[in-house]
Every structure is written in structure tokens, then in C-alpha cells.
Amino acid sequence: MIAMRIYQVIISFEVLSELEAMAKYIASIYRPESGHNYVNRVLGQLAALSYSADAYQHSRFALAKAIHPKAKTISIINHKWTVVFHIDGDFVIVDKIIPSKSMH
């Protein structure tokens, strides 16, 4: 049996600020709870990196590599967002969330 590595996920302050702005924007268009629900979905997918981070290869995108030389990427929320993260020891560090269309 292969032991699965579990990481602690750390979200950068920049990403937290982006998520807060995202929640406020969605709440201004729809309902306040819509913004919170959306961000909670994002946070749930980020939390899943604690056990899935090793499954992703280093990114081939120049934008991701510019953020961190050992960046990995994952698409979330119906491929609308790309999460740029890297692994450092026992930690998965979420560096940035970018609209997926800007990655290509």
C-alpha cells in the first residue's frame, strides 16, 4: 500500500483578499449568501489540495512559472479559475487565483 502524503494548505494574503473581493462582487450582483457560497466552494477545492497536490505536475505556463518557479496549477469551479500553487516541505502554498482564460 502506498502512503498518501498529507499537506497543510496555506493561502496567501493576496489570494484571501481576492476571494473577499470576489465574494463582495458576487453579493452585489446576486444575494449576499451567493458570494459566500461561491467562495466556500473555492475554499473547499483549495482544501482538497492537502491530499491531492502531488497528483499535479509542474506547470508549463509561463505566467505560473513567473509566480513561482516550481508552480503547479489546477482549474477549479468549472474551469473558470486557475489556482497557482507550490509545495514547500509539508505545505501547499496557494500563491494566486487567476481567471483561466488568462492562462492561455
Residues covered by each model-derived region:
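Arg/Lys-rich, positively charged N-terminal/basic patches that mediate binding to nucleic acids
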Residues: 1-45
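A broad, structure-centric signal for solvent-exposed, well-ordered loop/edge residues
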Residues: 18, 33, 56, 83, ...
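Residue-level signal for well-ordered alpha-helical positions
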Residues: 22, 52, 97-98
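A short, surface-exposed loop/turn module that caps and links secondary-structure elements
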Residues: 47-76
